[in-house]
Amino acid sequence: MDNEVEKNIEIWKVKKLVQSLEKARGNGTSMISLVIPPKGQIPLYQKMLTDEYGTASNIKSRVNRLSVLSAITSTQQKLKLYNTLPKNGLVLYCGDIITEDGKEKKVTFDIEPYKPINTSLYLCDNKFHTEVLSELLQADDKFGFIVMDGQGTLFGSVSGNTRTVLHKFTVDLPKKHGRGGQSALRFARLREEKRHNYVRKVAEVAVQNFITNDKVNVKGLILAGSADFKTDLAKSELFDPRLACKVISIVDVSYGGENGFNQAIELSAEALANVKYVQEKKLLEAYFDEISQDTGKFCYGIDDTLKALDLGAVEKLIVFENLETIRYTFKDAEDNEVIKFAEPEAKDKSFAIDKATGQEMDVVSEEPLIEWLAANYKNFGATLEFITDKSSEGAQFVTGFGGIGAMLRYKVNFEQLVDESEDEYYDEDEGSDYDFI
């Protein structure tokens, strides 16, 4: 579970970075994109940058020449910080970008991908090339397929664009017997016994292929085939319950074997695409159930959610992936640290006023609340789930509940929480900075 949460956070970080990098533009060709695959040799790339520096010295435009040389130098300096290449490769972006107010700003990003990259790239342009990072974001979850008919069964997997046949075997099942009397009953018994043994073997081989070290190794399972075999397997007590609960689709195909596998992939494309969507819906349905049943084991809005985090009461922290709220750290007149929250474009700056003096407090730091939560959620014993607003439940969570909430370990009565000193998350005189329904 922790690995899954960590991976989702890495994906979210890359997604946010790609969004900001894609918007960046510069003058001339002074924005460098450098991608080094896992087996790349850092000294070779340093030599290439030295050669590029020599070539760039001949650029006629003085302004562009100086910008490009500066970007190459920044890239070289960043690369020197790496004695060894990270196991999944390295992506560097360096250069001068134009800010919203028309000024030039030097930026440098170094990204260690959360999974291996298979591309080598060096480009100087007026934009950063983020295609490699965008490819990382494409779903690479592995799904298992069991294609089962009267001739045999194929076990396969699909991950991204890769289709793999894991195992297949044939079976010789008796056909239905046309004669009547005792003979028909005996054949029916034999036939039923053979079918039962066939389902048993499929269930056993499924465990061998889709469970590793007592853990299911696929995101979901698709059962495919002609006739009733796939349904018999799904309903069978012989089918490992760890796999049974992973079945996301049962599809009818016209063939067995590899042709049936290909057809099953086509027919289940929508189910595969919707797995994350379905997971999000299930999470939010469980959250809304807590609210409708008034269990007290839920909260929403920034104030209550942060109180619950402080109490260690949060089991699952749920946050809209595009939450824009900023977390400000101030110092008041008595040198106390004060935490406040506001939208980035908030016109009302009263949240920054020191109540004791009426003066604006000094800003110590500011960062998106969502980034602070991603960095600190573990300290509160919680797990972190990012959601989108693409499902109806997600849209309701964002518009009706402020895009932040939690499922709690135990009931918390927020109305009875009385702070002994001025709470850093909540100001009773001013009320919340937010108006959540």
From Swiss-Prot:
N5-methylated on Gln-182 by MTQ2. Keywords: Cytoplasm, Isopeptide bond, Methylation, Phosphoprotein, Protein biosynthesis, Ubl conjugation. The modification Phosphoserine is found at residue 421. It is found in: Cytoplasm. The modification N5-methylglutamine is found at residue 182. Belongs to the eukaryotic release factor 1 family. Present with 13100 molecules/cell in log phase SD medium. PANTHER family: PEPTIDE CHAIN RELEASE FACTOR SUBUNIT 1 (PTHR10113). This is Eukaryotic peptide chain release factor subunit 1. The gene is SUP45.
